């Protein structure tokens, strides 16, 4: 049996529907309960049904909230608990859960990928390497191969865009800002970027690095190609990818080579892209890839919809992920979601058990710090490297585990992504800071191995403590496989409070049920 919302996200005042798949069983009844945090907000009973049914659970006039859905199904003498979650927002851009698609042959048209991403509450989907060429995104050919030789059906791409829209998911076209093919470069050699030896920058002898400066014809050509992706294919926005290198280069547009700094050019490229695409789509989605956290300091405040960071060495420890999130929040003024694209090579190089442990720990760390993790995509797959098409497929069991983590994230959306929550982990605990004290276990506020990683965030009415168990983990490198953490019990925390406490609750995606339990 299965339970999931019909859409990845719902808008304020929209009817919320859940799909209950009874897997052909004859069911006497199902009791549906909807919770906001720990408060029961809706309940109904559905009697006598077989197979799939849609259950309407009402409309929610709220601007930003996550809800938990629990359904108890009675079939004969058996009672089965099913759980899912959904969120309601006044603007989808307030909560962006990023996933990916990369398979676009005719055979992939109905491969179940969109349906799976919907069950995982992925509401923004990057279409990786969907285009004909990086310098010529849209082709009229029905069947073509991309620059890496991958076969693509144009109709499959368009069908997936349509299907995503039906599920409340926004399709984002991958469009590298830097790359052109060799034939294009040879026609426009002065549009490229050059090193100090005045040789063109080229990546794997395929991609020529182009000049995105304000006065470069490449910038205008690129934005025109983005426009075609939206008008001809139906994409909702653009993923502006970069390579991360070079950071300085020479332009050959003038009479003599001129050194330019790309961190000074990229923000205006983002803003100009936003302004020009607004003419074809009133509110296009725009994501820029800060590869290795560069240049977040100059791009975070630009007119984009998230601060997106692709995480690479030397950002290699758990503490670095929290650092990236905190800095991105500061540079952006906390005005937009933060997404970490942190790919896990243990799914290629280590045992599946250790890889799954690494995935659960890393995602928990990112979510606990108020950001989103780009890892999942296609049909039950995860990313292990920067070339998305070489993803790793999960088993049904492992896919269900990561899906449950997503359910938990959405159910407690208010506690993870409230913009008013401040991270006080490093200032309110340890040494002579008595606001928070752990009296029973070794804890770390920056993700040390063999300790409980405790992140503390608070606002005027809530104090949130997020525990990630690193006990039994031999190191704190996020991109290495991990042994199964050793369960910890009887944790005692002392918290200083300034007013009467209304309630203390604990919840976890690892138990039998996700409903928060009161702590006496």
Language-model features: locations:
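Active-site neighborhood of glycoside hydrolase catalytic domains
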Residues: 214-307, 311-326, 332-333
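Beta-strand-enriched, solvent-exposed domains that form extended recognition/catalytic surfaces
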Residues: 1-91
């Amino acid at each position: 049996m299965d339970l999931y919302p019909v859409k990845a996200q719902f808008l304020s005042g929209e009817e919320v529907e859940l799909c209950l798949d009874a897997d052909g069983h004859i069911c006497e009844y199902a009791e549906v309960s909807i919770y906001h945090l720990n408060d029961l907000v809706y309940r109904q009973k559905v009697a006598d049904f077989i197979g799939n049914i849609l259950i309407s659970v009402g409309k929610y006039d709220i601007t930003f909230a996550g809800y938990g859905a629990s359904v108890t199904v009675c079939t004969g003498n058996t009672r089965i608990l099913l759980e899912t979650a959904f969120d309601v927002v006044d603007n989808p851009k307030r909560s962006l859960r990023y996933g990916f698609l990369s398979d676009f042959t005719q055979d992939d048209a109905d491969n179940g990928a969109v349906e799976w991403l919907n069950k995982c509450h992925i509401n923004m989907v990057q279409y990786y390497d969907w285009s004909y060429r990086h310098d010529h995104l849209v082709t009229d050919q029905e069947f073509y191969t991309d620059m890496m030789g991958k076969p693509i059906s144009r109709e499959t791409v368009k069908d997936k865009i349509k299907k995503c829209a039906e599920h409340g998911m926004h399709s984002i076209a991958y469009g590298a800002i830097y790359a052109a093919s060799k034939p294009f470069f040879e026609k426009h050699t002065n549009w490229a970027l050059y090193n100090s030896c005045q040789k063109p920058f080229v990546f794997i002898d395929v991609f020529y690095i182009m000049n995105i400066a304000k006065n470069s014809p490449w910038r205008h050509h690129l934005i025109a190609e983005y426009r075609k992706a939206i008008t001809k294919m139906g994409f909702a926005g653009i993923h502006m990818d970069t390579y991360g290198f070079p950071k300085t280069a020479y332009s050959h547009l003038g009479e003599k080579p001129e050194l330019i700094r790309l961190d000074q050019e990229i923000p205006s490229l983002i803003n100009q892209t936003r302004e020009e695409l607004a003419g074809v789509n009133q509110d296009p989605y725009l994501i820029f890839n800060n590869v290795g956290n560069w240049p977040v300091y100059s791009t975070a405040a630009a007119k984009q919809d998230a601060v997106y960071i692709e995480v690479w060495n030397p950002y290699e420890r758990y503490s670095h992920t929290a650092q990236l999130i905190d800095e991105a929040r500061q540079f952006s003024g906390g005005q937009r979601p933060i997404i970490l694209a942190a790919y896990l090579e243990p799914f290629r190089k280590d045992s599946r058990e250790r890889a799954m442990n690494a995935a659960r720990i890393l995602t928990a760390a990112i979510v606990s710090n108020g950001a989103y993790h780009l890892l999942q995509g296609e049909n039950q797959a995860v990313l292990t490297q920067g070339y998305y098409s070489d993803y790793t497929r999960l088993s049904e069991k492992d896919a269900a585990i990561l899906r449950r983590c997503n359910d938990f994230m959405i159910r407690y959306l208010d506690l993870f992504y409230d913009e008013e929550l401040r991270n006080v982990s490093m200032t309110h605990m340890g040494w002579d800071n008595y606001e928070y004290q752990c009296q029973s276990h070794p804890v770390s506020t920056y993700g040390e191995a063999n300790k409980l990683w405790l992140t503390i965030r608070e606002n005027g009415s809530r104090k949130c403590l997020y525990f990630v168990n690193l006990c039994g983990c031999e190191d704190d490198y996020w991109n290495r496989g991990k042994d199964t953490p050793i369960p910890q019990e009887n944790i005692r925390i002392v918290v200083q409070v300034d007013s009467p406490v209304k309630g203390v609750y604990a919840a976890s995606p690892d138990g039998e049920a996700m409903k928060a339990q009161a702590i006496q």
